[in-house]
Amino acid sequence: INAALDAGVDAILHCAFYDNDGSYRFDQKTADRLAASEVWLNPTMGLGNANRVRLANLKSERKLTQDEEERLERSTVSGENSLAQFSALVKAGVKLVGGSDCGWSYYPFGDFQGEIMSLHAAGLSPIQAIYAGTRSPAAALGILESIGTVEAGKEADLLVVNGDPSLDLECLRD
């Protein structure tokens, strides 16, 4: 993370506080440095969630292989670390942008809502999580003047839902 900040990147995807030996180690000083920067952070937490759901569903249908059991255990620990990490980064004030990696591995197309819900689970309010999936990506790409919010003169795709996503993000799946 520090090397990326030193290099002057605009965004970091799949940001994680892992040491070279693979052990998880959150570093508040680095988190504060990231929060003070103009760098956008894309956690892509939904990808790990999709893998855990897939393996849990398999486990309910049949006995998992040893490899699958090990992957589920690693993914569960990684997911817990990721949620704790991004919760701490939200508290530090890091600029989060939603991104899903959908279509890769076990993450299906059409479930960007899962990433928004993951951002909410990490500590963003429902509206902040929605912004992280709409306004923030446009701002991160430098195209907020033409997309990212519903305003006169801007292009927009609208999702009409049965409910109030500021109260319940689950209605984004309607």
What are these regions (language model features)?
Residues 20, 107, 168:
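Conserved protein kinase catalytic core
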Residues 67, 79-164:
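His/Asp/Glu-enriched, well-ordered alpha-helical/loop segment
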Residues 169-174:
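Short, intrinsically disordered, charge-balanced linker/junction segments flanking boundaries
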Residues 1-80, 92, 97, 102-104, ...:
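Active-site core of metal-dependent hydrolases
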